[in-house]
Design a protein with these regions (language model features):
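C-terminal catalytic lobe of FAD-dependent flavoproteins
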Residues: 337, 345, 349-476
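Central beta-strand plus flanking loop segment that forms part of the substrate or channel wall
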Residues: 106-111, 148-150, 274-297, 353, ...
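Extreme N-terminal leader/targeting segments of oxidoreductases
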Residues: 36-65, 83-87
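Glycine/proline-enriched, intrinsically flexible loops and inter-domain linkers
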Residues: 429-430, 436-872
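Glycine-rich FAD pyrophosphate-binding loop
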Residues: 82-102
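Flavin-dependent oxidoreductases
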Residues: 76, 110, 117, 235-345, ...
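Dinucleotide-binding Rossmann-like beta1-alpha1 core, especially the glycine-rich loop
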Residues: 107-186, 306-311, 315-319, 338, ...
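Flavin (FAD/FMN) cofactor-binding and adjacent substrate-gating region
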Residues: 128-132, 144, 153-229, 234-242, ...
């Protein structure tokens, strides 16, 4: 589908910043959040505030952790490390604390709005931390709990916010749906005639970002951390792939860990260490009016995404913040080192229409004078999620950056998450969606950042349809048969940068999305036909985006077997489904390992786990081991032939005997197809008889043509990722990063069948799995859930009820055309054993946008539970 045509234009670099990087606006964010100056500090001077700030001549020779960046995130990381017992922490700030973005942040404290459990918990923790900071440090942060309201002015946003509010309430956010009239009572100056509903959190509000940062820094100092201002990091030290210290103009600091919290400089800082941090600064705007007598200081924060704006009182006037749908990237070539408290000259012509639209929500603001129209840079990422975690390129080098305008909102929680991660070696929350290793190096290319950022900032206030795909910076990665799939009517979506067929339009129909919605869209019947063809006939599915590795060497089998919970070093020519676990017995990867021969293994993982899987192998293979990992993803196309007639079709194009006797389930063997050779593996992710073909990319078009021609007589149909989702969900197949994640025990995830506790040599995480088994019946389990009513749709984060009580939420879902309703996988938690009796004795329901629907819950696959169809 087409988003605004302007998305197709490359974003321009803006060079309208004021000439002096040190210069800062006299207004800043008004009296509440101006850039810090000595007179703002009750102790009588910025440097004098921190008694432990050292002169460069007294630079510490070593520290356990060096945090680079003194904004909200850097000080929060230091604060939490120190409070968790790691007191030998040094924060390096190249200028002064809060410089860059923190000083001009809006200071909103909002817990509502996310359908990520991790993000919601970080928001809640952050608010709670800010509430207690003053008592701990003696420094006020200006936290005013005046409340927060987001309004829905159209049906789709109402649907979205009802879905979000149900999930947020489950997570402990006290959000209430209110009428437009009630919105007007809470914010009397707002126009409410078109508002369908508002969503109100009384305990949320606003605070001063500068004071929050200073309080966190003081709290860190009180626990023994050191804060150094005016000390830039000019280089990284490392030894054999492990960080060893930081270079400064005044000498080096040896360090066991380095944390890059450099905000919009994080990409440039990462480059010094060879670490990829793909984020980009963009223009971000707000306007402050002259004083409005009718405006009271105690008004709640108001947000209206359909008008591009958020609103709060500021110094007697109205602050109008903007997230325009098409933004302007700033300084593609790099943020200047001395741009600390600077402003960008605002583009009135570009922003005028958006500003007009936003101010119409508060009509009185249109007649008020303009006190300040401010533009400052803020960093955004390609998928609007943070960049967090240990860098795959350099061990013990951590990053927390690219907060996409939620740095203050999640700052406390982000610091806690990263501190726990560093100290314990692994995180205690789901980080699959924000881990730095999800990105690839090309996403830091200037053209990519310029083009994608035009769209990404605007996504903050777009309606977050679950089927939406980013439209910019596309076309870089295509499979070898892309043109042939396009000719078949493929509608492509962004799949980790690849062009992945989502669904196929029938002949004569343009593959476009006519209208995004939460309901059945124009492509729904095309998807249904692909699903049914897989269950009844045969389909071709391009999965070339999957991560593929060839692992070779005399010790390759033993090392892979140690990483794998299942036995993967058995007979040659056999594929094995397995998980990789950490020492705590929770999941790190979900993949297949195929033994080609005693010294060659074929490892296949999901696209999102690509770099994580590669890094996991490299980090766990001893340096002197005779084992070598080669990423062959781009070298091989993956074409899957699936369905009851798949054997019949493939047998027409190969001389290899594919009978059930000669080529049973889990067999892997090289076969001939036309003039090509392909690795053929009998396996399925769709719940039917099927085969995966791995073909050298240069031969893939030839193989495709042979299969397509032979398929004409057996009704071959092409199928896309929508069908993949619905078919695998009916079967209850897991997808790491969607319905299972790094917080799940392999047993809780329902994958105990893929664990071999008795194999010689054991495996990484075995002791934790045994300990989990010893605890007795599981009280937390992944359960398949089917909505009995065929009409509603599930996507993610719908709350599951048992006997009227919330017991979990849907992690991922699709529509089960064979089962006759929406179907998903939910992690259920209870104070008792979750077994068949627990399921049978429950009255199950799912909340979908505020309405509850009867449901069926099952521990066994609802489709073909006896696995007969895949082994026939």
């Amino acid at each position: 589908y087409r988003v605004d045509s302007q998305f197709g234009l490359p974003g321009r670099e803006n060079s309208r910043e004021q000439p002096t990087g040190k210069e800062r606006g006299s207004e800043g964010w008004g009296s509440q959040s101006a850039a810090p100056s000595d007179k703002d500090l009750p102790t009588g001077g910025h440097l004098r505030l921190f008694s432990r700030i050292m002169q460069p001549t007294n630079l510490p020779a070593r520290a356990r952790v060096v945090v680079i960046g003194g904004g909200i995130i850097g000080t929060s990381v230091a604060y939490h490390l120190a409070h968790m017992g790691w007191k030998d922490v040094v924060v390096l700030e190249r200028d002064r604390l809060t410089s860059g973005t923190t000083w001009h942040a809006a200071g909103l404290i909002v817990t509502f709005g996310s359908t990520s459990e991790t993000s919601t918990e970080m928001r809640k923790y952050t608010r709670d931390l800010y509430l207690r900071l003053e008592a701990e440090t003696g420094r006020s942060i200006g936290f005013k709990q005046f409340g927060f309201i987001v309004v829905a002015a159209d049906k789709d946003r109402l649907e979205e916010y009802r879905r979000v509010s149900a999930f947020n309430r489950y997570c402990g956010v006290d959000v209430h749906e209110i009428s437009g009239q009630e919105v007007g009572q809470l914010f009397p100056l707002a126009r409410t005639d078109d508002i369908l509903a508002g969503f109100y959190v009384k305990e949320d509000g606003r605070a001063n970002p500068v004071d929050i940062t200073m309080a966190l820094a003081k709290g860190a100092r009180m626990q023994g951390a050191t804060i150094l201002e005016g000390v830039p990091a000019i280089g990284l030290l490392s030894k054999r792939g492990v960080v060893s210290g930081v270079q400064t103009p005044y000498g080096n600091i040896e360090a066991e860990y380095v944390v890059n919290c450099a905000g919009m400089w994080a990409r440039q800082l990462g480059e010094q260490a060879g670490v990829n941090v793909p984020l980009q600064a963009a223009e971000h705007y707000y306007l402050i009016t002259e004083k409005i007598p009718q405006l009271t200081a105690s008004l709640p924060v108001l947000e209206d995404p359909s008008s591009y704006g958020y609103y709060r009182e500021e110094g007697g006037g109205l602050l109008v913040g903007l997230f325009e749908p098409v933004c302007a990237p700033w300084k593609i070539d790099g943020v200047p080192d001395d741009f600390s408290f600077g402003e960008i000259s605002p583009d009135w012509d570009r922003m005028g229409p958006y500003l007009q639209k936003a101010m119409e929500r508060i009509p009185i603001s249109l007649d008020a004078g303009v006190k300040k129209f401010f533009c400052g840079p803020e960093s955004f990422t390609a998928d609007l999620r943070p960049v967090v975690g240990e860098a795959p390129e350099l061990k013990n080098y951590f990053v927390a950056a690219g907060l996409n305008s939620i740095g203050i909102i999640t700052g406390g929680g982000m610091g806690r998450v990263l501190a726990h991660w560093i100290i314990n070696g692994r995180p205690d929350c789901d980080v699959t969606g924000m881990h730095i290793d999800r990105f690839h190096k090309y996403q830091s290319n200037p053209d990519y950042r310029r083009t994608r950022t035009v769209e990404s900032l605007g996504m903050v206030y777009q309606c977050h349809y679950p089927t939406r795909s980013m439209q910019t910076a596309r076309g870089c990665k295509k499979s070898a048969i892309h043109d042939r799939l396009a000719a078949q009517g493929a509608y492509f979506k962004d799949v980790s940068g690849w062009e992945g067929p989502d669904w196929y339009a029938p002949p004569g129909v343009e593959p476009t999305v006519e209208q995004l919605s939460w309901g059945r869209q124009n492509w729904f019947p095309y998807w249904q036909a692909e699903h049914q063809a897989t269950r009844e006939g045969v389909i071709l599915m391009d999965m070339s985006f999957m991560a593929k590795f060839l692992v070779q060497g005399r010790e390759a089998g033993a090392l892979l077997n140690y990483l794998s919970a299942n036995q993967v070093d058995g007979p040659s020519g056999l594929i094995t489904y397995t998980q990789w676990l950490n020492e705590g017995g929770t999941l790190e990867a979900d993949l297949t390992v195929t033994k080609l021969d005693d010294e060659r293994y074929w490892v296949v993982a999901s696209d999102t786990a690509h770099r994580h899987v590669e890094t996991w192998m490299r980090r766990h293979f001893p340096a002197n081991a005779h084992a070598f990992v080669t990423d062959v993803t781009s070298g091989y196309a993956q074409i899957n032939i699936q369905g009851p007639r798949s054997r019949e079709l493939l047998q027409r194009v190969t001389t290899t005997d594919l009978s059930n006797t000669a080529f049973p389930f889990r067999t892997a063997r090289e076969i001939d197809i036309g003039f090509a050779r392909a690795l053929c593996i009998r396996i399925t992710y769709l719940g039917e008889l099927g085969y995966e073909l791995y073909i050298p990319s240069e031969q893939a078009p030839h193989v495709y043509d042979r299969i397509a021609e032979a398929g004409k007589d057996v009704g071959l149909r092409h199928a896309g990722l929508k069908a993949l989702a619905s078919l695998r969900m009916e079967k209850g197949y897991r997808d790491y990063g969607h319905d299972i994640d790094n917080t799940d025990s392999v047993l809780e995830a329902g994958l105990g069948f893929a664990v071999d506790l008795k194999k010689p040599g054991g495996f990484l995480g075995r002791e934790a799995v045994l300990a989990k088994k010893a605890e007795g019946p599981l009280k937390r389990r992944l359960v398949q859930v089917l909505v009995k009513d065929p009409e509603p749709l599930m996507f993610h984060a719908e709350i599951v009820y048992r006997n009227g009580q919330p017991v979990g939420y849907i992690r991922a879902a699709s529509y089960g055309f064979t089962l006759g309703g929406a179907v998903g996988l939910a992690m259920i938690e209870a104070g008792q054993a979750i077994d068949q009796a627990y399921l049978d004795q429950g009255d199950w329901e799912v909340d979908i946008a505020g309405r509850r629907f009867a449901a069926l819950a099952s521990l066994r696959p609802l489709y073909d539970p006896d696995m007969k169809r895949i082994k026939c």
